[in-house]
UniProtKB/Swiss-Prot annotation:
Belongs to the YFH7 family. PANTHER family: URIDINE KINASE. The gene is YFH7. GO terms for molecular function: ATP binding; ATP hydrolysis activity; kinase activity. One of its GO terms (cellular component) is cytoplasm. Gene3D superfamilies: P-loop containing nucleotide triphosphate hydrolases. This is ATP-dependent kinase YFH7.
Length: 353
């Protein structure tokens, strides 16, 4: 079993080490289907946030949110703006770029939009269209810390790769839609274009620095340091999740807020050495604030886990069908991950049998 408390300590130590140079740190957590990566990511996130809530309960009124950010960055200034007529055309086509659904070289574009909470934002879309959109909220109204419940302030946030599954209507437009649906979960059935763009955005925010008029000492805790270095000018970033009942992405399910100092990215292909996936590691590693974990587990153990999950999700009607679905798709994806793992030295391998 994975010691998630030890992982939490390692992540907080990285944040402490990098807090003068990085606004946030990232964690990559990769594993084959059924390896337990989602559960581990959720536990890790919960442990870190609970530790911070305990600190806040013992240190009331410690949080400061200031605007001393260096450098001031436009997170998507390099992206082309999608013109209104093209936005209308995309929406008319069910939020898709019909000619680009399989184009892994399609460059993400941006346009003005609204979040699901009706906040003004910049939407970033790629070959998966609006189903896999990233939405960056406008930075307008200053945060009033006094009006925030302290247990609502979370410094860690998970970002599952699942939200970047191409929608079923997107797969319908593939040259071979039958195979695309059958092999859903393989690398080509995710919007790798926009997930890489998300990593580029996160890297830019990571490299921002917030100065503080407080003098920190060697005895200052990491929670004390980060509590004095929240920034008003870091925007909220909304990313999609995945609804297993609807079998499609759901917009704005996760929010990487200005309080998020640890982003835990989990998924199958974040260390994959092909197409857009191969650029993710370097994009985040170049910030100097990244931890990378690969979960190793025997396929015999994952078969039963995944078969039961398929049955519970309604994808199959019997456990035997679940096992067959695992062998014809999930097992192939797991082996693909192992065969195409990027070759870098700092991947920490952990067992979860």
């Amino acid at each position: 079993m994975v010691d998630t408390h030890k992982l939490a300590d390692d992540v907080l130590q990285l944040l402490d080490n990098r807090i003068e140079d990085n606004y946030r740190v990232c964690v990559i957590l990769v594993g084959s289907p059924g390896s337990g990566k989602s559960t581990i990511a959720e536990e890790l996130c919960q442990i870190i946030n609970e530790k911070y809530h305990t600190f806040l309960s013992e240190h009331p009124n410690v949080i400061e949110v200031n605007d001393r950010l260096k450098p001031m960055v436009n997170l998507v200034d390099s992206l082309k703006t999608l013109q209104p007529n093209k936005v209308a055309e995309m929406i008319e086509n069910q939020g898709l770029f019909k000619d680009h659904v399989e184009d892994v070289n399609f460059q993400p574009v941006k346009y003005s939009a609204l979040t699901s909470n009706n906040e003004e934002c910049t939407a970033v879309v790629a070959r998966g269209g609006t189903a896999n959109a990233i939405r960056i909220a406008a930075v307008d109204n200053p945060v009033n810390v006094n009006k925030l419940a302290q247990d609502s302030i979370n410094i860690a946030q998970i970002v599952p790769m699942d939200g970047f599954h191409l929608s079923r209507r997107c797969l319908d437009l593939f040259k071979d839609p039958q195979t695309a649906h059958k092999r859903r979960g393989s690398p080509s059935t995710f919007d790798s274009n926009n997930f890489l763009q998300l990593c580029k955005i996160l890297a830019k925010t990571s490299l921002c620095k917030v100065s503080s008029h407080h003098k920190f000492y060697s005895t200052s805790s990491v929670f004390e340091k980060l509590s004095k270095t929240f920034s008003q000018t870091i925007p909220d970033i909304f990313v999609p999740g995945f609804n297993h009942a609807l079998k499609d992405p759901t917009p704005d399910q996760y929010c990487i807020s200005k309080f998020t100092r640890i982003v835990i990215l989990e998924g199958l292909y974040l260390l994959y050495d092909q197409e857009n996936w191969k650029k993710i590691y370097k994009t985040l590693a170049d910030t100097g604030a990244l931890l990378v974990y690969k979960i190793d587990i025997d396929y015999e153990a994952t078969e039963e886990r995944v078969a039961k999950r398929h049955l519970q999700s309604g994808l199959v009607t019997t456990i035997a069908e679940g096992r067959e679905k695992f062998r014809s798709n999930d097992l192939l994806n797991g082996r693909d991950i192992d065969n195409h793992l990027i070759k870098v030295d700092n991947i920490v391998h952990i067992r979860n049998d």
